[in-house]
């Protein structure tokens, strides 16, 4: 994962923000890596978490302009940092899934020296179906079958 992505995830973690990786990087975590031009980070849209996200963005050095806590509490904010292939998208909402419902179903992955949450498989599927764009439907076709551990 590129250095800027790791630095952003580190800043969010250090600030105590609640967030989940979604999009193509989540697809990779579920076993189907594909090329992408960005890192999609879904943040919990609450006032308390919004303050943490803003602190993380400031620590990262993001150009905040007029981004506010209220923006991060709305369910339709997309805040973009940089340009592809290193763009970071901070999302306050995604299609078809509620953050608080998805949080306990997340999977934890190890990236650099961090443990971060990734949207769980069923929520990933629900999001891609709800978004319905051709690339989202293709992601569903790329998603491998669920892995079962012996004894499950």
Language-model regions: role of each:
Residues 1-152:
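Compositionally biased terminal segments of proteins
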